[in-house]
Amino acid sequence: TVLDICPVTIGDNVFFGPNCMLATPVHPFRYQERNIKYKEDGTAYDDEYAKPITIGSNCWLASNVVVIGGVTIGEGCVIGAGSVVTRDIPANSLAAGNPCRVIREITEKDSIKYKKELF
């Protein structure tokens, strides 16, 4: 699901697992600012705003990942299942958790050719 009140930029060859959410809106914490208000002409408005999301090429976001507005995920990243991404993730990183944190860099040693159990 993409809630795109602000631009969402997705690079080439990005894989999304089921139930991923990209949410650009940011809501105020105080209910006085979050509740709907009305202008003199009767038009409704609120103080919601949004921040863009950028996902670099060749990323994989596993199942149930949530990406919050204002975040950039660098190229070649893997984001673990159930992660909530609240801050930028540098390129070629394995990251997971709630909140999502970088676990380590993805390197040549992660190549499938080194997984002897598969051959």
For each feature predicted by the language model, list its residue ranges:
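Flexible, glycine/small-residue-enriched loop-and-beta-strand segment within the central core
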Residues: T1-V71, N98, I106-T107, I112
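C-terminal/domain-terminus segments
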Residues: S63-C100, I112
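Acidic/histidine-enriched, glycine/proline-rich intrinsically disordered or flexible terminal extensions
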Residues: K113-F119
